[in-house]
From Swiss-Prot:
This is ADP-ribosylation factor-like protein 13B. The keyword Membrane applies. The gene is Arl13b. One of its GO terms (cellular component) is motile cilium. CDD domains: Arl2l1_Arl13_like. It comes from Mus musculus.
Amino acid sequence: MFSLMANCCNLFKRWREPVRKVTLVMVGLDNAGKTATAKGIQGEHPEDVAPTVGFSKIDLRQGKFQVTIFDLGGGKRIRGIWKNYYAESYGVIFVVDSSDEERMEETKETMSEVLRHPRISGKPILVLANKQDKEGALGEADVIECLSLEKLVNEHKCLCQIEPCSAVLGYGKKIDKSIKKGLYWLLHIIAKDFDALSERIQKDTTEQRALEEQEKRERAERVRKLREEREREQTELDGTSGLAEIDSGPVLANPFQPIAAVIIENEKKQEKEKKKQTVEKDSDVGLLEHKVEPEQAAPQSEADCCLQNPDERVVDSYREALSQQLDSEDEQDQRGSESGENSKKKTKKLRMKRSHRVEPVNTDESTPKSPTPPQPPPPVGWGTPKVTRLPKLEPLGETRHNDFYGKPLPPLAVRQRPNGDAQDTIS
């Protein structure tokens, strides 16, 4: 009677206990059967399972526990992310492929790394020796011996339970009893030390978040330093040439400016161009005035020649060269045929006159005239010829005759037709 009352009290206490949230991590080598085991626990068919890339998450209700299991990928490249899930896990489910004896050494090293981690040491671990349905699968004792499981567990002070199972034999309520038994044992151990584990998990999670924030800041600082170093190297490579190009090159202004500012800027540019044109014209006029001076017809003395300007000397030398060229041409013409003597004399006289003629340069013509604006293009049809229309024709005589109108028409002449009605007589 007393034991019955005690059992009733225990049941009442359990019924009043709140639902506890528990997080578990499922790890192991690739192709060990982790995803098939997780799906079988959740109630899904475990066949045709693809390799897990990253992780997958399943949620289930087991008694008074709301369990979340993180199924982590077992490839070599992805095992580095396992440590990110250790802080918030209450326990570990390690799945072993008992039919693959060649990878037992790799499994042993991986398990040792997991249990050695400070955020896993001391937490309960469930080892599932999977694929017992295959031939040549190792038994429970063989798996313990190959993994040196007893030594690892004692060294890291972890409670451990090993269960040989086969994840593909059933799912849901028909799941392998060994899997169900192992999961029940793991949750029972967690429930016995739930408060201590919760406190430890809270502490580890806070430390891990602080560490992640610090790593993020350090990463950002490294990126900033690398960027500054690249910019410094770029500026050093550019050197003074880059600075000179920046100074000499046009300054790129903002293309989106108010229209008033653009108009003022254009007016300033036009004024500068006009000033530049006027300065160029003045300089051209000065040069022409210095170059073009009235020349005297009579030859000057040698003293006057010495006192001439350099421009005048250039003109004289040019004149002499021209006269020599004309003389040489005359000599060539004289050596020609006799038939062209008259034409040669005429050309000779003309050339002699041209070579000995010295005319003063008109100063009025030297002054630059303002350029005449180009004529506007002719309108369309400007070049088409004018249409020459013929004069209006007039009648040769009078169009109206007074004696024509008002007279009756002449009678019609009735002529007998041959073979007519009048000739059809019967005698």
